[in-house]
UniProtKB/Swiss-Prot annotation:
InterPro entries: BACK (IPR011705), BTB-kelch_protein (IPR017096), BTB/POZ_dom (IPR000210), BTB/POZ_KBTBD3 (IPR030589), KBTBD3_BACK (IPR047062), Kelch-typ_b-propeller (IPR015915), Kelch_1 (IPR006652), SKP1/BTB/POZ_sf (IPR011333)
Pfam families assigned: BACK, BTB, Kelch_1
Domain BACK intervals: 150-250
Ranges for domain BTB: 52-119
Organism ancestry: Eukaryota, Metazoa, Chordata, Craniata, Vertebrata
Sequence ranges of the Kelch repeats: 291-337, 339-390, 400-450, 452-502, 548-595
Keyword field: Kelch repeat, Repeat
Protein name: Kelch repeat and BTB domain-containing protein 3
Amino acid sequence: MELAMDNSYAFNQRSTCNGIPSEKKNNFLVSEDHGQKILSVLQNFREQNVFYDFKIIMKDEIIPCHRCVLAACSDFFRAMFEVNMKERDDGSVTITNLSSKAVKAFLDYAYTGKTKITDDNVEMFFQLSSFLQVSFLSKACSDFLIKSINLVNCLQLLSISDSYGSTSLFDHALHFVQHHFSLLFKSGDFLEMNFGVLQKCLESDELNVPEEEMVLKVVLSWTKHNLESRQKYLPHLIEKVRLHQLSEETLQDCLFNEESLLKSTNCFDIIMDAIKCVKGSGGLFPDARPSTTEKYIFIHKTEENGENQYTFCYNIKSDSWKILPQSHLIDLPGSSLSSYGEKIFLTGGCKGKCCRTIRLHIAESYHDATDQTWCYCPVKNDFFLVSTMKTPRTMHTSVMALDRLFVIGGKTRGSRDIKSLLDVESYNPLSKEWISVSPLPRGIYYPEASTCQNVIYVLGSEVEITDAFNPSLDCFFKYNAATDQWSELVAEFGQFFHATLIKAVPVNCTLYICDLSTYKVYSFCPDTCVWKGEGSFECAGFNAGAIGIEDKIYILGGDYAPDEITDEVQVYHSNRSEWEEVSPMPRALTEFYCQVIQFNKYRDPWFSNLCA
């Protein structure tokens, strides 16, 4: 206790000294353990059975207590005493859903501020803290149970947290169940899971299953476990199965084996529609769960002579490369390549004899740009034309957002002095239609585009050619694909960049740029419009490829000089700001196409015979 004494003796007037009023003083009393002392006094009252003003009536016992303690500790009791409730005036409340042991444990905690949570009593404390709305105790129980989640109790904890409204425990238990789903779905506890919790499990991208077929089997098994009461839920659960990721054979088998159940629950037509969808647009759905897919980096290069082609893929999981069979991709000079689902789209380019090297291509006197769009299906090793763009274009960029392919910038057919295109188009792979969207705010050359959720960022230069060829990076646009709106951002990079020497990549919905001239990586904060230095990589060739995958950036190949091309591959781990070198490409390359693509494991065309 700290005590400051006032030396003045008059309360209503100031003292004087030789006719001069003295300065008035203040008293401050601070007792750091005041609250604990009050608790101790109240606990003494409880032990002495004095000053009680309220009673909790149990089935087998009446427990006296103090209103102030109940109201201070429990939102349930505070609300009861604040509102004009019968219990407030009667001075008692009857509680039937808690045991006397639980209520006494609560009162011990309320009067002392102390309790011990154990494996034996945690559920009791969790129940009473939920009912009596004791937030601190509820959080303590939740934290205790989160640390104990395992394969034996996770389903029970998921159910408990759902019943008691503990968001934190529910989220942790749900994540654990989703991660170990394939080990749990055959258990008895799983079959007793309620509809709402099962629905939350199934809708997650992170559901860890080896194939989507397992999700369909789980839905059917859970429904049949108590068919009479659960069949009404089947249409809702079927919607959570990504039916278009299943094979046609699997869907046909489901129709044959479950015809009666599907028809009685109005799900037969849902499966029929999925079969039509798979037949007509199989491989064009990018929503496969990560656990059901294999991810690759796809590399393609056509030499200047237009005849020699090099195509290979890198398996992310196994850190291994595979040289792919001849695909005969028609990648014209100045064309752009983007992946979508299990397909690859090539747009535009020059039909004439333009040089492929960007430095020489840009200086050609005439560009015979095409409006053609090609689709490559690696599963069938098939390459075919789809709908043409509205405007021929070359030296543009393409990127996927909101399940559509956007083509941005570039130049159309004509002489070299034609300005860059402002027109922007988007292609729907399912409807096979091109539409025009809002145009660019102004012209841009050497565009680099990356998608972060629904936003497309485009970086480039406002000039095409400078004396040193390397134009500065001075254009920075943002396009909201959901609202079809462009905005121009201030390119405050903090230092000078060359437009042709940076690579823009998305990592975990954050935009990064890799500067191939200074070997540095920067991330962009959309709230402040500021670029932040994230670290440096050891080296990188000019014209290297760059790809963002999950929390990693891959930088591949490139050239240090016309006759010095590298096959090196470096990986930047953004979550720990570290670089490492992984398996090199099968061949040294510069100025090549580089995209991420993934396949359902059951139809992965590149899985076997991977070579390091």
